[in-house]
């Protein structure tokens, strides 16, 4: 039996789904089972989705515990995910064993408790799963189109950081020279927009502005 966590990516809009799968056949063609994910696959076509196996595990409990540490409430609040429920809750839609769905669930928490204990006491393991959950977001954030969608998402509009949070952010940014010089995501870049295509994007300041495009960023068309 193979146990693994995986990531499904919509190649058209870069939205993702993180899930788990148990199977005896790694070539079973499994492409996720989330409700929103299935709707998107019907809409865009399964050929426009890619699958990446994140990590293999020795047992189901360790697999679910790993998913729990990736698909958190913070993860679910992101606008670029298809996940609807917290990770680690189990269920049987991820299992691919003939006749398994007709058998009683034989739940053993031994593996999960062992993994949880190891996770809570292993800083390197915590960092590993934190990176899995954040690396995709960082890659998406590097694209102007994603940032615009994220910032305009209704769940994040009219929300403000508390003074305490703002001070913590300032202290953190001061320590790592956040957004200074070449670390600034805008370094050497400029915004241009097209009224015909109704889109804004970044280009290098040294690049010529294409015909029909204008300098500056436009949020609404």
From Swiss-Prot:
<comment type="similarity">
    <text>To endonucleases of group I introns of fungi and phage.</text>
</comment>
<protein>
    <recommendedName>
        <fullName>Putative endonuclease segB</fullName>
        <ecNumber>3.1.-.-</ecNumber>
    </recommendedName>
</protein>
<dbReference type="GO" id="GO:0004520">
    <property type="term" value="F:DNA endonuclease activity"/>
</dbReference>
<keyword id="KW-0378">Hydrolase</keyword>
<dbReference type="Pfam" id="PF01541">
    <property type="entry name" value="GIY-YIG"/>
</dbReference>
<dbReference type="InterPro" id="IPR000305">
    <property type="entry name" value="GIY-YIG_endonuc"/>
</dbReference>
<comment type="function">
    <text>Probably involved in the movement of the endonuclease-encoding DNA.</text>
</comment>
<keyword id="KW-0460">Magnesium</keyword>
<keyword id="KW-0255">Endonuclease</keyword>
<dbReference type="InterPro" id="IPR035901">
    <property type="entry name" value="GIY-YIG_endonuc_sf"/>
</dbReference>
<feature type="domain" description="GIY-YIG">
    <location>
        <begin position="1"/>
        <end position="84"/>
    </location>
</feature>
<keyword id="KW-0540">Nuclease</keyword>
């Amino acid at each position: 039996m193979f146990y693994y966590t995986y990531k499904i990516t919509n190649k058209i809009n870069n939205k993702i789904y993180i899930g788990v799968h148990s199977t005896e056949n790694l070539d079973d063609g499994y492409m996720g089972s989330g409700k929103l994910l299935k709707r998107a696959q019907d809409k865009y076509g399964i050929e426009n989705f890619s699958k990446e196996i994140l990590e293999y595990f020795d047992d189901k409990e360790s697999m679910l515990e790993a998913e729990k540490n990736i698909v958190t409430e913070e993860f679910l609040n992101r606008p670029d995910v298809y996940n609807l429920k917290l990770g680690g809750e189990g269920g049987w839609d991820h299992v691919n064993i003939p006749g398994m769905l007709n058998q009683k669930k034989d739940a053993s928490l031994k593996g999960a408790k062992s993994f949880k204990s190891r996770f809570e006491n292993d800083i390197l393991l915590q960092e590993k799963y934190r990176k899995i959950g954040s690396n995709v977001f960082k890659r998406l954030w590097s694209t102007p189109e994603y940032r615009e969608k994220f910032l305009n998402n209704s769940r994040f509009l009219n929300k403000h950081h508390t003074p305490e949070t703002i001070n913590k952010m300032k202290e953190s940014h001061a320590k790592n020279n956040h957004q200074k010089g070449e670390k600034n995501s805008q370094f050497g870049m400029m915004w241009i927009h097209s009224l015909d295509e109704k889109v804004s994007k970044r280009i290098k300041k040294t690049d010529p502005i294409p015909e029909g495009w204008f300098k500056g960023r436009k949020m609404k068309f």
